[in-house]
Amino acid sequence: MKNNLTEKGIKTINKWAEKYGIKELKINDEKVLNLKQLCIFDTNIKHIPAAIFKITNLKSLSIYCNNLKQLPKEMHNLIKLKRFNIDCPNSENFPDGIAKLINLETIYIRNCNGKLNLQYLIGGIVKLNNLKSLYLDIE
C-alpha cells in the first residue's frame, strides 16, 4: 500500500511537535514513511494530528497522555497496525473504524476512564479476527 504522508502532513506533524517541545518527533525526510513503531509518552497534548495516521507502515502505536481527549478518525488508515496501546485517562472516545484495523493482534487499553462508549468499542473489537490479546482496564 502506498504511504499517504504528504509534505504538508510532515510540516503539520513538525509544527505540532515543535509546539509541544517534542524533538524526537521531528520529521525531516522520507524515512518516516517506513516508521514501524511510534510511542507518544508523557506529553501534555490534547489531540494528535491526523497526519500521523497517514504513516501506513506503522505496526505498533503506544500513546500515554493524560490530557488527550480523542484520537483522529483517520486512525483506521493504520491497516498494518498489529499492536495498539493506549493509556489516556481523559480520552472521551475512540474513532469509528477500529474494526478496519484487521491486522491488530494486541490491544491494551488502560485508564481510559473518560466518556468511552464501551459497547461501541467492543462491537468493533469483536470483528478483529487476528486479535490474540486484549487488555481492558476501564472503570
Walk through the language-model features, giving the residues of each.
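Concave beta-strand-loop units of leucine-rich repeat
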Residues: 39-44, 62-68, 85-91, 108-120, ...
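The feature encodes a structural signal of leucine-rich repeats
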Residues: 25-26, 48-51, 71-74, 94-97, ...
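LRR N-terminal entry segment and analogous cap-like coil->beta motifs
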Residues: 2-65
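Generic detector of contiguous secondary-structure segments
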Residues: 1, 88-99
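Low-complexity intrinsically disordered segments
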Residues: 3, 9, 40, 53, ...
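Leucine-rich repeat
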Residues: 32-33, 54-58, 65, 77-81, ...
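A short, hydrophobic secondary-structure junction motif
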Residues: 38-39, 48, 125-133
